[in-house]
Amino acid sequence: MRRVALSVLFQSSRVLHFTDLRDKQIALCNAAPGHTVQFHQHRRHSSAPVSSVGGQNTFSCLGASCAGLLHPSRVRFANRRRSGSTSKKAQVKSSVNQLAIPSAATRERRKPKLSNSCAPAVESQKVGVAPTTSRASGETRTSCAPPPASRMKPSFYVVAVGRQRGIYSTWDQCSEQVKGFSGAVYKSFRTLSEARAYLTAHPARSGLEKSDRGDGAASLSALSEPQVGLRRSRAAEAEASYVVEAPAQPTLRQRVEEEVPSGAAAVQRAESSVPQVVYVDGACSHNGTPKARAGYGGFYGSTSDSRNFSLPVPITEAQTNNRGEMRAVIHCIVQGFVDAGVPPAALGTSHCVEPDWELSELPQPLRRLVIYTDSRYVIDGLTRYALKWVANGFKLASKEPVLNQDLWRQLIRLRDAYNTRYAEQQHWAAATCSHASTRVPAASQSKRFHTHNTRNDETEGIELRHVKGHSNDYGNEMADVLAVAGARMHGTSE
C-alpha cells in the first residue's frame, strides 16, 4: 500500500491545494461548501480511479461543512485530461472552471442525516463519544457507548498489596503505597463498584503492608506489647486517611469455614491461596560473652497482625544469635500448624523435639509458608546439610558434633512434617477432583518425611528466602526490631 504525506500548499478563494494524499482514502479539509480541494501528486502512477489535470488530482467539496474526514464516496472528481503545454496557474484555473460542482439542492440532498436515537454528534464529541457514519444510508449515528476503558481516565486506584491496602482517588495517593514496595499489586478502575470487586477478589495476604513508615526504617518506639504485635504509629493513621474504602478481610479460618464446606474443596482453596509471608530475625547483645542475651522476632507484614512475635531465648540455654534465628523459624512453622487448627498451646512447646500435639491430622489446610531470613546459617543447614546430618548422626566432617543439635532436630522434623502434610494435601486435591470420596493414603507420602527432603522452592510447603540484613528492607528491619526487643526482655524477667 502506498503511503505519502499530506500538506497544504496554498489556499485560493475557492481552491485548496494539497500535496499527495495517503492512498486517496481520507483527507483533512476545512473548505466551505463548493470549495475545491486540489491534490498535487508527486508520483504519477496511482491505482486509485482519479483523473489528472496537469499532474494534479482535483475534486470539489460537497458537504455542508467539510470539516472532518472526507471519504472518496463524498467527493466528485473532474474528468480532465492532462495538458502538457499549459502553465501551472492556467491548469489550476482550467480545472476550477471545468469542475462539475453540484447545486445547492444536490448538496442539501446529500447532507448526512442525524439519527434521533441518541444525542447529536456535536454534543457527543463533547463527552468523548465519536459518531459513526453509515455508508449505505448516509446517516450519521452517534454511539452512546463510552470510549474504550484503555482510553478513559481512571478515577479509582486499588492497592491490593502495598504499604496500605485500599481504594484511592488519585494516582499520587496510590503511588505512595506502591512505589519502592517489593511485590506491589495495584490496578486502576473507572467505577467504584469495579474497584470494590477487585479488592474483594484479592484478599489481604500476609505479604508486606508497610503502614508505619515509608522509608523502611523502624524503631523501638513503635513497640507496645511485642508478644502480640506492633502499635500503629501516627504516620500510619495519617497514611490510612487517604483510603477511600478498604473493606475488612476475613481470616483464613473464616474463609475456609464460610466458603469451603468440604475437605476436598478446602484443599483446592488452599492450593490457590496466596502464600503466607513472614520475616524473621534473631538478635543477641554481648554475643560470645557471659553477659550475652539473645532474642528473636517475626513480622507478618502488618503491624496489626496479632501473630507478630518478640520473645527471648530461654535463659536455660546458650545465648547466641544463631539460636535466636533458629527459634524464630521454628516459631513460624508451629504458627502455620496453629493456623491450620493445632491448639495455640503448641506455641509454648515449640522448643520440644517431640511435642505433645499431633502433626498429621489437621482440620484445615496448610498454607504455603515463605520465610524471609538474613541467616545463611539456617538456610544452608536446612537445604544443604540436613540430609547428611540425619544420616551421620549430626556430625561434622571433622567428626565433631554439630552445634545446636536440639534445635536442628526440632527444626528439621517440623519442616519435613509441614512439607509432607502440604504435599499430601496437594495430591489429595488432585485425586478428589473426579472422585471426592477417594483419598490418597498418607503412607504414599511418608517417604518425603523419612528422607528429610532438602528442596527449597515454590513447590514445597515451606520456602526459605534470603534477605540481606540491614539493607533498608522494611520486613527485615521490623523483624530486627522485634528480635532486639525480645533480647531486652531478659532484663524484665530476671
Swiss-Prot record:
Gene3D superfamilies given in the database record: Ribonuclease H-like superfamily/Ribonuclease H (3.30.420.10), Ribonuclease H1, N-terminal domain (3.40.970.10)
Membership in a protein family: Belongs to the RNase H family.
Name of the molecule in the record: Ribonuclease H
Annotated region (Disordered), positions in chain: 79-148, 205-231
Assembly behavior: Monomer.
Function text: Endonuclease that specifically degrades the RNA of RNA-DNA hybrids.
Annotated RNase H type-1 domain residues: 272-488
Organism: Crithidia fasciculata
GO BP, sorted A to Z: DNA replication, removal of RNA primer
